Amino acid sequence: MNIKMFVISLLLVSFGAQALIINENNPPEYQSFKSNYSDMIELANKSRLPHRVFYTSPSTGRNALWFDAVKHGDLNEVKKMLANGQDIEAKDTGSLDQTALGWAAFIGDEEMVDYLISQGANLWATDKGDVYNVFKSAVLGNNVNVVKKIHALMRSDIEINNQRVESDGETFIMIAASNNRIDIVKYLISQGADVNLVTTTQDTSLFSYNHSALSYACQNNLKDMQRLLIRNGAINHRTGTTSCH
């Protein structure tokens, strides 16, 4: 083991030691996380949403302990901290300024989401990663039940196919498709999501330039996502067919 890997291992062990064992099925250094290790890896990793990886090192900043409790899924600790005056709308300054609800929605911790909402957490919480409400945080995540719950609360204020909110014209189904969120894409389609919209940005330097849900699935080699979208009428606007090439 080289020095870098040794240091990382020590950090992970230290991180895991900060909380109670919540999930004994995880590798030892991740047993303090409620989420399954495999689910966390699927959610965010070096290749997918690397700026939202939350399980490799402790939180930093003024509210670090609060965000560690949220990320670990330690609901009892979250309740205690709120009872002792913790600001529920505090921002995770060591990351992208997410709120607790933003993190919980992304992680897909349904119990945590329910509790934070019951305590009045703001559904319009933003973060610096181009998130403008908690529904988008949930769509970036991978728990369709959380998406459904938040959508039910925000339905009258959110247009599934609105291309005016994101500066590049991305829609929720594009975001979910690009991150291989199969169940969420199915739900969005059931709610009327247009599978053939294309981003509106004219800035060719942007990653999102000239993309649709299917072109994202093609670019990221997401075969199951491609099949799902095509079954629901998607055409690759770049090829004029259902083909990626």
Language-model features: locations:
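Ankyrin-repeat-protein effector appendages
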Residues: 20-62, 218-219, 223-245
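Alpha-helical segment of the N-proximal tetratricopeptide repeat
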Residues: 64-80
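Ankyrin repeat domain, specifically the short helix-to-loop turn at the C-terminus of the second helix
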Residues: 79-88, 114-122, 149-159, 186-194, ...
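Ankyrin-repeat boundary/"N-cap" motif
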Residues: 57-68, 91-100, 126-135, 161-172, ...
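Classical Sec-dependent N-terminal signal peptides that target proteins to the secretory pathway
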Residues: 1-21
